[in-house]
Amino acid sequence: MATNVNEEQYLDLIRYVLANGHQKGDRTGTGTKSVFGYQMRFDLSKGFPILTTKKVPFGLIKSELLWFLRGDTNIRFLLQHKNHIWDEWAFKKWVESDEYQGPDMTDFGHRWLKDPEFKQVYLQEKKAFCQRILEDDDFAQKYGDLGLVYGSQWRKWKTSQGDTIDQIANVIQQIKTTPDSRRMIVSAWNPEDVPSMALPPCHTMFQFYVNDGKLSCQLYQRSADIFLGVPFNIASYALLTHMIAHQCGLEPGEFVHTLGDAHIYLNHLDQVKEQLTRTPHEAPKLILPAEPKPIDQYEMTDIKLEGYTHEPAIKAPVAV
């Protein structure tokens, strides 16, 4: 079996944090083993870097990235593709509104994990909420929109003059016309917005680099949940690099993933240790349409993985 060099980058990160991590408290009250400043490099010519030592749901990664690239900030698109990653943020807005008359949902993010009875009520309320977002246009407009999330920051960055900047269109234009530029950057971190945001951006900025007909991308991620979040982030930004390279007539080069606070939650230690006992499979291949579409017009069926063999999923609690 060929060595999966890209996956070893991720498994080495787990080993490094287990061996060298500092025990820290955190916003969620769960506690972590954490290191500061770590970099992984994924050679995109050596297969698509989605983990094979556990199943990673590529459909969720695709629909979320397409949502960002459309500049969409309403969870309705995600729900139409059975993606529930962002539900809680919209649901929170609904249950804290004056219109909501249902059961008390105060601090639902923690309560449903600890109280089985409340969990049933919460899941029922959230399911009804999601169904209403899908069926009721006015309700979806009012409560499905998350405001300042990645889609808005990438495609409609609000300026002090009151207009907007399309950072994705700008960066594609730069790659095509001034490929040696050192300013090919997309930022999601706006200090003015951070205090009022539900969750300040974890992926704060990314930069592109062109060399020898290849496009590389580096992401700076301020906060990295190694077991649950990072596998998604690697696959998402690798997919983004492939798609933008395709737009610009380039081959994908490297995805460089730089982490700020890289942490394993204390309630994920058994899971990462189990993952380290597994042997990686060969990396799959990403298939995109022969001719690129406009970046905001890709459909789910345009993006495929070929030969994705993986070990079973490993369940773990989310820290909220």
From Swiss-Prot:
Binding site for (6R)-5,10-methylene-5,6,7,8-tetrahydrofolate: D225, A319
A GO cellular component annotation in the UniProt record: cytosol
Swiss-Prot/TrEMBL GO biological process terms: dTMP biosynthetic process; dTTP biosynthetic process; methylation
Enzyme Commission no: 2.1.1.45
InterPro entries in the cross-refs: Thymidate_synth/dCMP_Mease, Thymidate_synth/dCMP_Mease_dom, Thymidate_synth/dCMP_Mease_sf, Thymidylate_synthase, Thymidylate_synthase_AS
Protein's cellular compartments: Cytoplasm
GO molecular function: thymidylate synthase activity
Keywords recorded for this protein, A-Z: Cytoplasm, Methyltransferase, Nucleotide biosynthesis, Transferase
Family, similarity comment: Belongs to the thymidylate synthase family. Bacterial-type ThyA subfamily.
NCBIfam families: PRK01827.1-2, thym_sym
Stated name of the protein: Thymidylate synthase
Organism of this sequence: Limosilactobacillus reuteri (strain DSM 20016) (Lactobacillus reuteri)
Phylogenetic placement of the source organism: Bacteria, Bacillati, Bacillota, Bacilli, Lactobacillales
